[in-house]
């Protein structure tokens, strides 16, 4: 397994760490630690992609698992933010529904021997979601919440982009 794929696996492994820290202890220090864990996990997303492209280490595993790891990480943090009242539930429902709809689309593509790589709109969506989430974890809602609404728009747009670009897969089913 190459380094970018190891970073993707690390991101997945940090999700339960974030979950345990954030959900089972409520103090400013613990929230800060949870934010650090989330931030490290988010940073692995950028680092694994950079390394994969720079050193030509792009794999089908990475193309499939990297976006899945992002979805799991972001969903865990957003659900937590709803529970602590920092993020509206409807926003999370729309984002998570789109994330899993695209995961289903990727599974259909995979069953047909096709891997759908992340598109530019999907990358913008991920960046805005992660930055907004970090700000909300730090309770900087005045900036974090508007960024999450931008993330919502990017999420809907990129979902449409994936569906449009994969319409040949959908029409075959």
Label the model's feature ranges:
Residues 1-173:
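Alpha-helical transmembrane bundles and membrane-interface segments of multipass inner-membrane proteins
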